Swiss-Prot record:
Substrate binds at residues 57, 73-75. It comes from Halalkalibacterium halodurans (strain ATCC BAA-125 / DSM 18197 / FERM 7344 / JCM 9153 / C-125). Is synthesized initially as an inactive proenzyme, which is activated by self-cleavage at a specific serine bond to produce a beta-subunit with a hydroxyl group at its C-terminus and an alpha-subunit with a pyruvoyl group at its N-terminus. This is Aspartate 1-decarboxylase. GO terms for biological process: alanine biosynthetic process; pantothenate biosynthetic process. Pathway: Cofactor biosynthesis; (R)-pantothenate biosynthesis; beta-alanine from L-aspartate: step 1/1. Belongs to the PanD family. The lineage of its organism: Bacteria, Bacillati, Bacillota, Bacilli, Bacillales. Binds 1 pyruvoyl group covalently per subunit. One of its GO terms (cellular component) is cytosol.
Length: 127
């Protein structure tokens, strides 16, 4: 049996732009992608803290060091520039590996810079 487990999380990213006329996806700074092992074309879930929207899309690489989090295509209708979002990636983990599985969690500041890396979800709220 396999379980669907959180693999990576980008916590409190700020939407830098939205582009309705692009084919689709979320553009993320490649340095930030690397920090939590998210790769181009990987499926992710987006949670918008401002309006409660939850949706899925895939990732495309943005310029390194840019801090970009741009929602493209139809997803652009679910966010506004400045919204705080959470980006979550999942993986199928074999039952025998579930207890050892450690997701990578990056906490970002208002400028989309990583301010903390967590090995697991904290027991308290991270703002």
């Amino acid at each position: 049996m396999f379980r669907t487990m959180m693999k990576a999380k980008l916590h409190r990213a700020r939407v830098t732009e939205s582009n309705l006329n692009y084919v689709g996806s979320i553009t993320i700074d490649e340095d930030i992608m690397d920090a939590v092992d998210i790769v181009e074309n990987e499926k992710v879930q987006i949670v918008n803290n401002n309006n409660g929207a939850r949706f899925e899309t895939y990732v495309i690489k943005g310029p390194r060091g840019s801090g970009v989090f741009c929602l493209n295509g139809a997803a652009a209708r679910l966010v506004q520039e400045g919204d705080v979002i959470i980006v979550i990636s999942y993986a199928l983990v074999a039952e025998e590996n579930v207890k050892e599985h450690q997701p990578k969690v990056a906490v970002l500041n208002e400028s989309n810079q990583i301010v903390e890396m967590l090995g697991t979800e904290p027991a308290s709220t991270v703002l």
